[in-house]
Amino acid sequence: MAGIRIERLLKRYGAVAAVHEFSLEIADHEFVTLLGPSGCGKTTILRLLAGFLRPDAGVIRVGGTVLSSPEGVVPPERRGMGMVFQSYAVWPHKTVYENVAFGLTVRKVPKAEARRRVARVLELVGLGGLEDRYPGQLSGGQQQRVALARSLVVEPGILLLDEPLSNLDAKLRERMRWELKDLQRRTGITFVYVTHDQAEAMALSDRIAVLHAGELLQYGPPRDVYARPASRTVADFMGLVNLLSGRVARPGAEGVVSVAGRPIRVSLPDGLREGQGVEVAIRPENVGVSPEADGDAGVLPATVAELTFLGSVTDCHLALEDGTRLRAQGVALDAFRVGQRVHVRLDPAHCTVFGG
């Protein structure tokens, strides 16, 4: 099946636009995640893709074929897509085999062919030998695999997944992430995945679409979205970030921003002028802390305000001379003590500047 093309999609519920002017292209065989907070429109987009909803404007195409528009919607059963729901939606009175074979039964696939396909997909998801068990005899992770197998057995070109891991405990959720990604690679099916979990999106995806209030804010590989956020909203949503207020001292690609009265060398986007207020974004893991200053622009005197051991890293809260707070995280930070005077380095390569 060819790629997905979504063009200027609009879906309203009364006066509220759940999805507004949303456009996206997904390549064949790609794993794309729709990421955003509750109410951002990601599940609505998934339901529009599935054919459960009709758009008020815009078009959804797969391989050049129009599947959805205000004029009409191709029924879900004719789209060549599978869907895995958050709640698993497995029938408790049917065995694993009967749950997985349901779509084949509806399609009147011959019994011998159905048995072959069910056996193959159960092996694929790690449920071989459990055909005769009922859902009540399975763990949560196994029930989720039943839901996956049921969607895969009909051999869809596209698989839609609506927060399928949210009901699992943390350790099982982490293991299932790897299994999902491995499954997608082995099958070559295009996965469109919905979640509000940033770590999940980064672990699974070839590309991430970050949504807010029904609009697309940024679309790209996980590393780009995390390290080079397109806006303050994306930077804040994608994980812990320091947002430091400053003013442009010298515009340009080799610019300087004054933060807490000290010069910080950083590349500035076009359009910023001298004296303009800005915010400098940097992740805690990219903040350097040392007992001595190295003399470069980008070093800020600070005091260690708080230290918290988090297991793999130490979380360090720092107070700059003007009272501004920022955080650093790293393995070596447990060598410092609360109240100690230190020097903070903001590496220009890891800084992103947003206009005020």
Explain the meaning of each model-derived region.
Residues 58-69:
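Conserved ABC transporter NBD signature motif
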Residues 50:
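Helix-to-loop junction immediately C-terminal to a conserved catalytic motif
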Residues 227, 256, 260-307, 334-356:
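Glycine/charge-rich catalytic "coupling/switch" loops of P-loop NTPases
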Residues 5, 25, 61, 343-345:
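ABC ATPase nucleotide-binding domain
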Residues 22-33:
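Pre-Walker A (P-loop) beta-loop-beta motif of ABC nucleotide-binding domains
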Residues 76, 80-82, 86, 90-233:
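ABC ATPase nucleotide-binding domains
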Residues 35-37:
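The feature captures the beta-strand-to-loop junction immediately N-terminal to the Walker
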